[in-house]
A protein has these predicted regions:
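Low-complexity, glycine/alanine/valine/leucine- and proline-rich hydrophobic stretches
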Residues: 417-472, 477-478
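A long, amphipathic alpha-helix that forms part
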Residues: 167-194, 204, 210-257, 284, ...
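Polar, surface-exposed loop/tail segments
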Residues: 374-381, 385-407, 463-466, 470, ...
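Beta-strand elements within well-structured catalytic alpha/beta cores of enzymes
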Residues: 2-19, 33, 57, 101, ...
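Short acidic, low-complexity intrinsically disordered linear motifs used
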Residues: 517-537
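Active-site-proximal alpha/beta segments of enzymes that process anionic O-linked groups
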Residues: 16-189, 199-206, 308-316, 322, ...
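A structural signal for well-ordered alpha-helical segments within the folded catalytic domains
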Residues: 28, 52, 92-99, 174-178, ...
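Secreted, luminal/periplasmic, and some membrane-associated catalytic domains
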Residues: 19, 71-90, 94-104, 111, ...
Length: 537
C-alpha cells in the first residue's frame, strides 16, 4: 500500500453555511484540514442533482456519457419528459472509480455513496447509498457484510417527514454517529481508498434552511429563534464525527472533502417556461385548459396541505394513475400538442430545459427537422432577454456522448431568486406556501473541495474552478494509476505535491454496474426516500 486516501462526502455542503462556522471556530476538523491543505469551490453537474452529480464524480464523465440526468429516467419521447422508472446503479454502464481500482488490485471501501444501489462486486466492500428501498438496513457487497453492520437510520422516510424539526435533527444526529461507528469498523481491514457520503448534511438543508433566513415565508420569528440553530448543529456534528473518524485512521492519510453540489434557500417565486412559450407563440393550450389547470393546481395544493397521505398509500397507486398525476403536475394534458412547437422539461434547480416538438421524434411532433436549429436559436436569443434567466445554451454546450439525445434541446440557468414552475398562464407566480414549508432548501451549482495530506500542496491555488468530474481522474493519478482517455475530468495537478506526469490509458469496457430492473417493492421504497426530500412528488 503506497498511499491511503479518504474521500469524505458531505452531501450538499456549501461554503455559504460553512464559512460562518469556520470563522467562529465551530468546525475545527475542517479548519485544521484547510490550514494543512487548501480550500476550493467545486462546480457540480448540470443539473446539480445528487443522482447525476455522484455518478459524474464516480465516473469522471458528464451526464451525456453516463446517461443519468435525474432520479427518474428522462424519456423525451413522452410529453411528461420522464417515465415512471427510477434511476439506479443499473442505469449507467460506465466504469466507476471503484471498478478501475479493482482492476488495479487496489482495495476500496465505498460507504453510502449515492446511486450505488443495487451494489455490485468490487475488490473491497460496498454499502449502497441513497436512495435504497429501505434506508434503515444495509445493502452490501459482499452480501454477508450487511449482517455485521446493523441498521443505518432508526426511522423510515414517513417517520422522518412527520417528526418535529427537533425530532428530525435528532434522527440526523443519530445517523451521523452510526455512520462513523460503521466506518471505523470497516476501516480496520486493509484498504487503499475509503469513501463515504454523509447524507444528513443534505437532508438538514432541505428541511432547516427556512429557519436560518429572517422573513422566510410562513416561518415566524419565534420558530426561527427556536430552530435557527438546527442546520448549523448538523454541520457541527458532521465535522466532529469526521474528526472522530480521522482519529481512528492513519495520521499520514491523504484526505479529500467534497460535496456534490451546494445549497441555498428555496426561491419564493417561479418562472413558468410553458407560460412564457405560450406568450411567445410557441405553445398552445387546449380550449378551456387554463381554467381547468388552475383548479387542478389548487386541488393538488389543498390536498398536500390537508390530506394525511402517507408513502404507504402513495406507493400503492396504480401505475396508470401515477402517470396521470405526472401529466397533471407538468401540465402536459392541457397542451394542444399539434399546435405546439416547444415545451418545458422540468430538471433540478437552477436548471430548466426546453424540448422542441420535432416531427418523427415526439408523438405529435410538428417542427420539421429543417426548422430545428433556426427555431432553437430563436428561442435561445429571446430567452437571453429575460431578467429571470442567468444563462442559456444548446444542449451540445453542456453535454456530449451517447446519451446526448436524452437531454433537452435547450438548457437554461435561472437567476437565484427564481425556481422553475409549471403554470400555463402567468409567466411569474409565487411558490405555494406549503411547498416552501416542506422543502425550504434547494441545490445550487457550487459545492466544496478541501484537499489535505502528504500528497497535497498546502494552500494550493487553482487557475480554473475545479469540477466534480475532476475528482476521479485526480484520485486515480494520486494512487499511481493511469487516467482513462474517455474521462471528461482532468487531473488537478496544482493540488498535488508530485510532479509525476499523467499517464493516459484505454478505458474499461462499459458493463452495467447492477441490475437495472427493480421489483415493485424496490421501486416503492426508493420512491419514498426520494419523495421525503422533494426529488419526486
Amino acid at each position: 500500500m503506497e498511499r491511503q486516501l479518504l474521500i469524505a462526502g458531505l452531501d450538499g455542503a456549501t461554503w455559504t453555511v460553512l464559512d460562518p462556522l469556520l470563522a467562529t471556530g465551530r468546525v475545527p476538523t475542517l479548519a485544521n484540514l484547510i490550514t494543512r491543505g487548501s480550500k476550493h469551490s467545486l462546480r457540480s453537474t448540470i443539473p446539480p442533482i445528487s443522482s447525476a452529480a455522484w455518478v459524474t464524480m464516480m465516473s469522471g464523465m458528464n451526464p451525456g456519457q453516463h446517461g443519468v440526468f435525474d432520479f427518474r429516467n428522462l424519456d423525451l419521447s413522452q410529453y411528461t419528459a420522464h417515465d415512471e422508472r427510477l434511476a439506479n446503479a443499473g442505469s449507467y454502464s460506465v466504469p466507476t472509480l471503484f471498478d478501475y481500482l479493482s482492476q488495479a488490485n487496489l482495495t476500496s471501501i465505498a460507504y453510502q455513496v449515492p446511486m450505488t444501489y443495487p451494489p455490485w462486486p468490487i475488490r473491497g466492500q460496498m454499502v449502497a447509498g441513497y436512495p435504497t428501498p429501505d434506508h434503515q438496513r444495509a445493502y452490501t457487497w459482499p452480501p454477508e457484510l450487511a449482517g455485521s453492520l446493523g441498521r443505518l437510520y432508526t426511522h423510515s422516510p414517513d417517520q422522518i417527514g412527520a417528526a418535529t424539526p427537533a425530532g428530525q435533527a435528532s434522527i440526523y444526529h443519530r445517523y451521523i454517529t452510526t455512520m462513523t461507528d460503521q466506518l471505523i469498523q470497516l476501516s480496520r481491514g486493509s484498504w487503499d481508498l475509503l469513501m463515504f457520503v454523509n447524507g444528513a448534511t443534505d437532508g438538514a438543508q432541505h428541511r432547516f434552511f427556512k429557519f436560518t433566513r429572517p422573513g422566510f415565508p410562513g416561518v415566524s420569528p419565534a420558530e426561527q429563534q427556536q430552530h435557527g440553530h438546527l442546520l448549523d448543529d448538523i454541520m457541527i456534528a458532521a465535522d466532529a464525527e469526521l474528526g472522530r473518524l480521522l482519529a481512528a485512521l492513519p495520521a499520514d492519510l491523504d484526505i479529500l472533502v467534497i460535496s456534490d453540489h451546494g445549497a441555498m434557500p428555496r426561491p419564493g417565486q417561479a418562472f413558468n417556461l410553458n407560460a412564457w412559450l405560450a406568450r411567445e407563440g410557441w405553445l398552445n393550450l387546449r380550449a378551456g385548459a387554463s381554467a381547468t389547470r388552475r383548479r387542478s393546481q389548487q386541488l393538488v395544493e389543498w390536498a398536500k396541505q390537508t390530506l394525511p397521505i402517507t408513502d404507504w398509500a402513495k406507493r400503492r397507486l396504480p401505475a396508470r394513475f401515477k402517470q396521470q398525476l405526472t401529466s397533471l403536475r407538468s401540465g402536459a394534458g392541457s397542451i394542444d400538442w399539434p399546435r405546439t412547437q416547444a415545451y418545458r422539461v422540468k430538471l433540478s434547480h437552477p436548471i430548466e430545459g426546453i424540448h422542441l416538438n420535432l416531427q418523427g421524434r415526439q408523438p405529435a411532433g410538428v417542427v420539421p427537422t429543417t426548422d430545428y436549429e433556426p427555431l432553437r436559436q430563436e428561442i435561445i436569443a429571446r430567452l437571453r432577454t429575460r431578467p429571470e434567466i442567468l444563462a442559456v445554451c444548446p444542449r451540445e454546450a453542456a453535454y456530449h456522448g451517447p446519451h446526448l439525445a436524452n437531454a433537452p434541446d435547450i438548457l437554461l440557468q435561472l437567476q437565484p431568486d427564481f425556481d422553475g414552475g409549471a403554470d400555463l398562464v402567468e409567466i411569474v407566480t409565487p411558490i405555494p406556501a406549503g411547498w416552501l414549508q416542506s422543502i425550504s432548501g434547494y441545490h445550487d451549482l457550487d459545492g466544496i473541495l478541501v484537499a489535505a495530506g502528504p500528497s497535497f500542496v498546502p494552500q494550493a491555488a487553482l487557475a480554473q474552478q475545479p469540477q466534480l468530474q475532476d475528482i476521479t481522474p485526480t484520485v486515480l493519478h494520486l494512487l499511481g494509476q493511469p487516467v482513462p482517455a474517455n474521462m471528461d475530468g482532468r487531473v488537478l495537478l496544482p493540488l498535488l505535491a508530485s510532479s509525476r506526469p499523467v499517464v493516459v490509458s484505454s478505458p474499461l469496457p462499459n458493463t452495467p454496474a447492477g441490475d437495472n430492473q427493480l421489483s415493485p417493492d424496490e421501486e416503492a421504497g426508493i420512491a419514498a426516500a426520494l419523495r421525503d426530500l422533494g426529488y419526486i412528488e
